[in-house]
């Protein structure tokens, strides 16, 4: 998989996680464990995107 393709896939994953976080947060009683897990995963995806961008330069 090329770097661009990997970055595109990570961007999609990041957007999907953001959507899931928003959905969970808007529930009447959001599950804090789920929110924490989703936010950690989103951060990992963001860090991977930054790492790939740095390598591509």
What annotation goes with each model-predicted range?
Residues 1-57:
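Extended, charge-rich alpha-helical interface modules
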